[in-house]
Amino acid sequence: MSTSMSVARSLPGGPVAEQILAEVAQEVTQLRAAGVTPALATVLVGDDDASVGYIRIKQRQAVQLGFASPHVRLPASASQADLQAVVTQLSADTSVHGVLVQHPVPPHLDFDRAMQALDPEKDVDGMHPVNLGRLALGLPGPTPCTPAGIEALLAYHEVPVAGREVVVLGRGATLGRPLAMVLAQKRPTANAAVTVVHTGVPDWPRYTRRAEIVVAAAGVPGLVRPEHLRPGAVVVNGGVRYAGRRLLPDVDESCATVAGAMTPRVGGVGPTTVAMLFRNAVRAARRTRSSRTPVRLPDSGAPAGR
């Protein structure tokens, strides 16, 4: 007698990203026709392989979309004053509409202090304290890219979120905490009952086992296994680590035998994060055109479903 094992439905991020980037490209075309070339400046400190790779991806995408893409690279030995001087200069440059400081920075530097030197209107990562405060209050503003991308991914694949129990496993400033705020917003693509738990809680699986949606955001490879999940749960693999160029996700691939739907190891959340970066950037450029009627792209971070 043979038995078959169910496999979770895949939730790829590629189609979501393509839809968002098509909207961005249309807006870039309109801005350029009005005499504005959107410019996204990137800042990299040091030579971390993963960070260099990320910057190359973003610069390549910027060129494809029609953005100008100035880049500043500082040595790993750069001081806090060096980094903040660059950020301040880019903030004051009227030809630059968005600024991305690639994270992580070398350990002797304070990323948060550098972000405070940035004009909040040019914060395409959504990580300036002013913009995080706006998110907490439910006010419009740049949303952190990975949380916004996760909301969009779930909406595109028609995964119901409103009223469901969501557990975010991880409390980091770039994903776990802002994602909890995003998914608790009062709108159809969010409005969830969100619990944030982390590896400092000895019995964290007690929370994930009851969740209808689990978002892994801990940055601990292989942390989430099938026994940590409720059968049929939706699983989003947001947390990753790199060993050289090898991607090590939080969610073990064997979870696909228990989950009802799951993002793939490669091509899941990553593409939507990049797409949201450019959506934030084009909106920053659009805000400089105060005299023109804005194109009304949705502010929720969630494109329409399929």
UniProtKB/Swiss-Prot annotation:
<comment type="similarity">
    <text>Belongs to the tetrahydrofolate dehydrogenase/cyclohydrolase family.</text>
</comment>
<dbReference type="GO" id="GO:0004477">
    <property type="term" value="F:methenyltetrahydrofolate cyclohydrolase activity"/>
</dbReference>
<comment type="subunit">
    <text>Homodimer.</text>
</comment>
<dbReference type="InterPro" id="IPR020631">
    <property type="entry name" value="THF_DH/CycHdrlase_NAD-bd_dom"/>
</dbReference>
<dbReference type="Pfam" id="PF02882">
    <property type="entry name" value="THF_DHG_CYH_C"/>
</dbReference>
<keyword id="KW-0554">One-carbon metabolism</keyword>
<feature type="binding site">
    <location>
        <position position="199"/>
    </location>
    <ligand>
        <name>NADP(+)</name>
    </ligand>
</feature>
<keyword id="KW-0028">Amino-acid biosynthesis</keyword>
<keyword id="KW-0560">Oxidoreductase</keyword>
<keyword id="KW-0521">NADP</keyword>
<feature type="binding site">
    <location>
        <position position="240"/>
    </location>
    <ligand>
        <name>NADP(+)</name>
    </ligand>
</feature>
<dbReference type="GO" id="GO:0004488">
    <property type="term" value="F:methylenetetrahydrofolate dehydrogenase (NADP+) activity"/>
</dbReference>
<keyword id="KW-0486">Methionine biosynthesis</keyword>
<dbReference type="InterPro" id="IPR046346">
    <property type="entry name" value="Aminoacid_DH-like_N_sf"/>
</dbReference>
<keyword id="KW-0658">Purine biosynthesis</keyword>
<dbReference type="Pfam" id="PF00763">
    <property type="entry name" value="THF_DHG_CYH"/>
</dbReference>
<comment type="function">
    <text>Catalyzes the oxidation of 5,10-methylenetetrahydrofolate to 5,10-methenyltetrahydrofolate and then the hydrolysis of 5,10-methenyltetrahydrofolate to 10-formyltetrahydrofolate.</text>
</comment>
<dbReference type="InterPro" id="IPR020630">
    <property type="entry name" value="THF_DH/CycHdrlase_cat_dom"/>
</dbReference>
<dbReference type="GO" id="GO:0005829">
    <property type="term" value="C:cytosol"/>
</dbReference>
<dbReference type="GO" id="GO:0006164">
    <property type="term" value="P:purine nucleotide biosynthetic process"/>
</dbReference>
<feature type="binding site">
    <location>
        <begin position="170"/>
        <end position="172"/>
    </location>
    <ligand>
        <name>NADP(+)</name>
    </ligand>
</feature>
<dbReference type="InterPro" id="IPR036291">
    <property type="entry name" value="NAD(P)-bd_dom_sf"/>
</dbReference>
<keyword id="KW-0511">Multifunctional enzyme</keyword>
<dbReference type="InterPro" id="IPR000672">
    <property type="entry name" value="THF_DH/CycHdrlase"/>
</dbReference>
<dbReference type="GO" id="GO:0000105">
    <property type="term" value="P:L-histidine biosynthetic process"/>
</dbReference>
<dbReference type="GO" id="GO:0035999">
    <property type="term" value="P:tetrahydrofolate interconversion"/>
</dbReference>
<dbReference type="GO" id="GO:0009086">
    <property type="term" value="P:methionine biosynthetic process"/>
</dbReference>
<keyword id="KW-0378">Hydrolase</keyword>
<keyword id="KW-0368">Histidine biosynthesis</keyword>
<protein>
    <recommendedName>
        <fullName>Bifunctional protein FolD 1</fullName>
        <ecNumber>1.5.1.5</ecNumber>
        <ecNumber>3.5.4.9</ecNumber>
    </recommendedName>
</protein>
<feature type="region of interest" description="Disordered">
    <location>
        <begin position="285"/>
        <end position="306"/>
    </location>
</feature>
<comment type="pathway">
    <text>One-carbon metabolism; tetrahydrofolate interconversion.</text>
</comment>
